[in-house]
């Protein structure tokens, strides 16, 4: 996935916006309730360059989820928002694994992200209280060979774990 887009967004009007928003956006029930399970998902071998956000996985009301794996993910020149895996529904997301993930951010000098209290995303990424990885309402997380870096200075923490049960960390750097 590479940004900016060759052609402008159809909905950008006079702005003729070409930025690429998110590489992966897995969000059942983003626009209206979509009840059911999200399980046994494998997202593998993806590369992202010059995107606003590499990936956002969000469960909403009426969704249950387990066994979500993102592996062999590379992101360069990422611009605006941390990667995130979140549950805002009735139950937490169980068994999330990030393995062999390397994300490099351009950097955000916006001091407003520090201490921000995130709310449920509507239909896309949004500003978060960290620049690299945000996890919310997850039961069990395994981070293996995860690297986060920021090219032009860091504002705020690299990662935020909000209401996360057990976390196993193996070879993680930022």
Please tell me what each predicted stretch does.
Residues 1-174:
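Extracellular/periplasmic carbohydrate-active domains that bind, remodel
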């Amino acid at each position: 996935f590479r940004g900016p887009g060759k052609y402008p967004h159809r909905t950008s009007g006079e702005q003729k916006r070409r930025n690429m928003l998110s590489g992966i956006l897995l969000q059942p029930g983003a626009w209206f309730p979509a009840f059911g399970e999200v399980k046994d998902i494998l997202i593998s071998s993806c590369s992202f360059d010059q995107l606003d956000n590499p990936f956002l996985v969000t469960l909403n009301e009426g969704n249950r989820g387990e066994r979500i794996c993102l592996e062999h993910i590379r992101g360069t020149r990422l611009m605006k928002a941390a990667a995130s895996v979140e549950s805002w529904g009735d139950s937490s997301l169980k068994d999330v694994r990030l393995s062999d993930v390397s994300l490099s951010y351009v950097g955000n000098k916006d001091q407003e992200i520090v201490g921000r209290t995130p709310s449920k995303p509507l239909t896309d990424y949004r500003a978060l209280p960290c620049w690299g990885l945000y996890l919310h309402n997850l039961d069990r997380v395994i981070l293996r060979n995860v690297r986060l870096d920021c090219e032009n200075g860091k504002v705020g923490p690299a990662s935020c774990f909000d209401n996360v049960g057990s976390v196993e960390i193996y070879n993680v750097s930022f």
